[in-house]
C-alpha cells in the first residue's frame, strides 16, 4: 500500500514511516520542515528509511493534490504543537492545524483517496483542567480503557462522575 505521511520527517511521523516500510508498505513523506518543529532541518530520508520525500506545506493545495495521486491512504501527522512562545503564535497554529487539515481533506476528496488515519493530541486524552459544577476546577486522569471501549470519550469528574466542561 502506498501511504502518504504528512509531517513524516517529524518525531512521530518518522516512526510511522519506519513502521510502514518494515510492514512492506511504500511510505511517501510530505513535510514543510518548519523551523519551529525542525530547528536543524533533517536531510530527506535521514529520520527514517528511504522514502519518497516531498518538501511542501500541507496548506499548499496544489502540492497536496499532486502528492495524493497514486496514494492509497493518508496518515496525517503534520501539525504545530503547543502555542510556541505566546498567544501571538495562535494564527500560525490554527492555520497549520485547521487549514492544513481542511486542505488535505479537500484534496483527498478531489483525488478519491478515501483512507485516513488522523492524529489526535494530548487534549483528546484528558490533558488540562476541567470544571465540575459541584467541585469546581478538577484535573481528571487518563481515560479508563473500559470507558473508551464503551464509547465514553468525554472526561468525568474524578470525585462525583459528573460531566465536565473544559476549564
Indicate where each model-derived feature is located.
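N-terminal Rossmann-like NAD(P)+-binding domain of SDR-like oxidoreductases, especially those catalyzing
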Residues: 1-167
Amino acid at each position: 500500500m502506498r501511504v502518504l505521511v504528512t509531517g513524516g520527517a517529524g518525531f512521530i511521523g518518522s516512526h510511522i514511516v519506519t513502521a510502514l516500510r518494515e510492514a512492506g508498505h511504500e511510505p511517501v513523506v510530505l513535510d514543510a520542515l518548519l523551523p519551529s518543529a525542525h530547528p536543524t532541518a533533517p536531510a530527506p530520508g535521514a529520520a527514517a528509511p528511504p522514502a519518497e520525500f516531498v518538501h511542501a506545506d500541507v496548506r499548499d493545495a496544489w502540492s497536496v493534490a499532486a502528492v495524493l495521486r497514486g496514494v492509497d491512504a493518508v496518515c496525517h501527522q503534520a501539525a504545530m504543537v503547543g502555542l510556541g512562545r505566546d498567544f501571538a503564535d495562535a494564527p500560525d497554529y490554527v492555520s497549520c492545524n485547521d487549514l492544513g487539515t481542511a486542505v488535505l481533506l479537500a484534496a483527498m476528496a478531489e483525488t478519491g483517496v478515501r483512507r485516513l488515519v488522523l492524529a489526535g493530541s494530548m487534549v483528546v486524552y484528558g490533558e488540562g483542567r476541567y470544571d465540575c459544577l459541584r467541585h469546581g476546577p478538577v484535573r481528571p486522569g487518563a481515560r479508563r480503557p473500559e470507558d473508551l471501549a464503551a464509547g465514553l470519550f468525554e472526561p468525568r469528574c474524578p470525585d462525583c462522575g459528573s460531566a465536565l466542561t473544559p476549564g
